[in-house]
């Protein structure tokens, strides 16, 4: 299992979640505004906007905040954000992809580079590590929506490539270009998903020792705490012992 999938629940452990909630809402609103600006402000006609709204709802972002972010896209004096992807190597040579929405490229690049350097890694050129990942569609449903067999059957019928089911829910993986089609088919059967978005999926993962794993987690936390960073993906795998320790904290 990819490192980021392993620790995404750890990142929301008690204390951290409350501390990040206001910052998270700001990031979600930024993605909604940018998505609405890039296409129509109607989520039924704009797949990216729909995905952004789904992500906001999954985090219990108030409806008023969502609507305000959409309306902001129509404002003539609204901020303009650039989409930037940074790629680099973290501790242990682990590949890391950082996606950002920024109104100041120089500031964000400097801050991201600093995080990599302080962790013992280094920021590289665009394209340096992305070839180690596949760009795919990911659709997440709550566990109670269906049992594993029903979800697998429906997903394959809809054209998906893979399904992972656990007590935490179902994750359906499909080709990037098939995301909207697969999502519609599964929504018709199971209702609205928790999440539907394009993601980076590691082709292979790297096992790291516990010391390196903790350094990588700190790097990811620092990156995700940055106001401009939207997503962080890495290709490492944590040991069961470290996962158990972190989950107990």
Swiss-Prot record:
One of its GO terms (molecular function) is DNA binding. This is Probable transcriptional regulatory protein Xaut_3062. One of its GO terms (cellular component) is cytosol. GO terms for biological process: regulation of DNA-templated transcription. The keyword Transcription applies. Keywords: Cytoplasm, DNA-binding, Transcription, Transcription regulation. It is found in: Cytoplasm. Pfam families: TACO1_YebC_N, Transcrip_reg. InterPro entries: Integrase-like_N, TACO1_YebC-like_2nd/3rd_dom, TACO1_YebC_N, Transcrip_reg_TACO1-like, Transcrip_reg_TACO1-like_dom3, YebC-like. Disulfide bonds: none annotated. Belongs to the TACO1 family.
């Amino acid at each position: 299992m990819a490192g980021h999938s392993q620790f995404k629940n750890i990142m929301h452990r008690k204390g951290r979640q409350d501390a990040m909630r206001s910052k998270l809402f700001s990031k979600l609103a930024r993605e909604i505004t940018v998505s609405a600006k890039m296409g129509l402000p109607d989520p039924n006609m704009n797949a990216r906007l729909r995905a952004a709204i789904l992500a906001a709802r999954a985090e219990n972002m108030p409806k008023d905040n969502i609507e305000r972010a959409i309306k902001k896209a129509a404002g003539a004096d609204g901020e303009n954000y650039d989409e930037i992807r940074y790629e680099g190597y973290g501790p242990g040579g682990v590949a890391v992809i950082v996606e950002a929405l920024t109104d100041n490229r120089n500031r964000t690049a400097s801050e991201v580079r600093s995080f990599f350097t302080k962790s013992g890694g280094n920021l590289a050129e665009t394209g340096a590590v992305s070839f180690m990942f596949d760009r795919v569609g990911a659709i997440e449903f709550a566990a109670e929506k269906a049992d594993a067999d029903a979800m697998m059957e429906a997903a394959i019928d809809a054209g998906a490539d893979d399904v992972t089911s656990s007590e935490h829910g179902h994750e359906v993986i499909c080709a990037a270009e098939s995301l909207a089609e697969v999502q519609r088919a599964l929504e018709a059967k199971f209702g609205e998903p928790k999440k539907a978005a394009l993601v980076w999926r590691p082709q292979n993962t790297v096992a790291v020792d516990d010391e390196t794993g903790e350094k990588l987690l700190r790097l990811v936390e620092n990156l995700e705490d940055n106001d401009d960073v939207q997503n962080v993906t890495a290709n490492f795998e944590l040991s069961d012992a470290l996962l158990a320790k972190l989950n107990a904290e």
